[in-house]
Amino acid sequence: MMKKLLSLGIAVFVFTSCARGEWRLVWSDEFEGQTLNTAYWNVEDNARGGGNAELQYYAPKNVTIEKHPLSGESCLVLNAQRENYKNRPCTSARLNTHDKVTVEYGKVEARIAFPHTADGLWPAFWMLGNNLATNLGNNDDVDKRAAQLAAEGRVVWPKCGEIDICEMGHHTGIENGTQDRFFNGACHWGESFNNGAYPNFGQFKTADYPVQGDFHLYTLIWSEDSIAMYLDQDRYPEAEPYFQLSLRGKEVNEPGHYFNHPFYLVLNLSVGGFFPQMPAAEKYPEVITEDDSSFQKVTALPADGTPVKMYVDYIRVYKKRG
């Protein structure tokens, strides 16, 4: 049964379930319709580069629902490809559930087939605090709008908090030749950006087997006291987490002060940026061409414009029983 709840004045769709065990399903998207469910998802349309000097234009046309070519399962697909589009040399996709679906504690899992990232792709499944002001443009606007943001109950990054459940494509994996097994989880927080000197914690993992090209399960378990992330819990239920962070410290600048409110979901497939060490020459450039020195290093996108695809089979959110 589906019911509509109100959380912080936000319409949030939640599914109830009679599933057995420690966890009960409270929301999911199985991506089985003909089109994306926009009651849940916002599709981004911009060239801001995520604040990370990325190279792509995020275009709504690059978000599709398709059958996986091998499994036949209906999936959300994020497509990245070479094409000159709105002053960018490539396009890709990013979408989020801001102000539509939020999570506060519980278990979040996603079954995803990440693409082969080397060299230059940066896919991620992550979360941001739902109190984030999303319409700022770039960081230059923050000081001018501080009072207005406070009145709206909004904050700027990283005060909202960020939970990166899985990222791939880091330059270390490229350098070590382990890019198909190298991934990480991370958290970011703090009162202000502070020229990059904000608190954060990340843990990198080199898996025993490839985690690109095929489906794998990525799980976040989040309580008032801790955050933990797991790979393939369905196959390896006793495996140790690849990321752990204590939230017991609740003072300002301690993580427990920032990860105690609703967060929304984000999926994206970036091209270039700081993470793979292929950034644009400027953080917010007006124009990037195919002659850009960083774009010249991107080998993961076929020269003929064939899309590279990130498949998402499902995302599910659970709460503990009792």
Mark where each language-model region is:
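GH16 jelly-roll
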Residues: 20-322
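Hydrophobic h-region of N-terminal signal peptides that target proteins for export
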Residues: 9-19
